Amino acid sequence: MPIALVTNYLAPYRTPLFTRLAERHGTEILCFGAGDRYIPEWFRDLDRQLEDAPFPARRLHGPRETLGLGRRYDAIIAPFAGGAILPAAYASARLYRRPFLLWASVWAQPRSLTHALTRPLTRQIYRDADAVIAYGEHVKRFVARARGTDDGIFVAPQAVEPELFARAVSGAEIDAFRARHQLPPGPCVLYVGRLVPEKGTAVLLDAWRRVRTPATLVVIGGGPLADAVSSTPGAVLLGALPRAELAVAYALAETTVVPSIPTPRFREPWALVCNEAMDQGSPVIATTTVGAVAGGLVRSEETGVVIAPGDPAALAAAVDRLLADAALRARLAVAGRAAVAGYTYDAMARAFDLALAVATQRRGRNRRSS
């Protein structure tokens, strides 16, 4: 029987991972299609994603179907998402005595009435999972505290497509991008992502009004704060762009900003924008509440510039500093490229390999002892 990997959508940056898992383990990807709050509009067409997937994938129709997964699959991998989907996947694995693996992205306890009421259940899932696959070292530390041990936790380094983001971008491509999007001449600062409070959009716009160096803030993405971006002097909103164009935007930018802030329900799990920018040699400015910072990819003054969240003055100062210091930008670009080179899909898949092997072994021991 195949292995079930439960997720919400087929994000394009997960395709190389899911393809490897299908080839190695006969994994089938089951999509429940929820969690729209954290999913960009430009890849919410789940039916199209499933139709185009180069690996076995189908819809998962709610908790009731999830409860029966143990009848059809040898093991179940599920994320910390989807409301009742996670406990249903865990219950199914235990009911049918299958290995259960948690794909963990949370690294700070969410604060809400719902999370408070369900905390005993989530604590049980953390502790009883046969193995945990963590987004990074920061998530591993959080999960280890919940489990009381770091045994059985495997870090799967977050990866993006090198053929898109690490490729050489020509000056002609940059010139064409500028002309196509009517960008003024001069330095550019780049933001890529959803335009929502937790991504620090309001902080970024406040900071931009304080930046002293003449430059253009180029914003790629959409969301409820799009109008605020459009009305900010010196900011140009491009909306959503094809992923194939993003490398040119990163190559154009003197720096890429990732100003995420914590909220009661959200702490940036990773921010793959950091990987994308570093692959292209665009120095990153990120806050301490970005997973790529807490997880060790973006290291202050080594592979990027790190600031406190929610501090527009600090963000403006960091932007001015990078715009004024070409040598610093060059040093961070070289170090960033070297650091992100180890964040590959093969390394990510190996973590799943190890986790599946350990989970299968543990479940086998538990069966023999019961």
Kindly give the residue locations of the regions a language model identified.
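Acidic donor-binding loop of glycosyltransferase active sites
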Residues: 251-269, 282
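Donor nucleotide-sugar binding/catalytic pocket of nucleotide-sugar-dependent glycosyltransferases
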Residues: 123, 127-176, 183-184, 238
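Conserved acidic donor-binding segment of nucleotide-sugar-dependent glycosyltransferases
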Residues: 240, 299-301, 305-312, 321-327
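Conserved donor-binding/catalytic core segment of Leloir-type glycosyltransferases
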Residues: 183-199, 205-209
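A short, well-ordered alpha-helix in the C-terminal region of glycosyltransferases
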Residues: 179, 314, 321, 328-342
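A short, histidine- and acid-enriched strand-loop-helix "catalytic/donor-clamping" loop
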Residues: 84, 98-116, 128-131, 162
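Nucleotide-activated donor-binding/catalytic signature segment of Leloir-type glycosyltransferases, i.e.
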Residues: 227-247, 255
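Short hydrophobic beta-strand element within catalytic cores of glycosyltransferases
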Residues: 258, 274, 279-288, 298
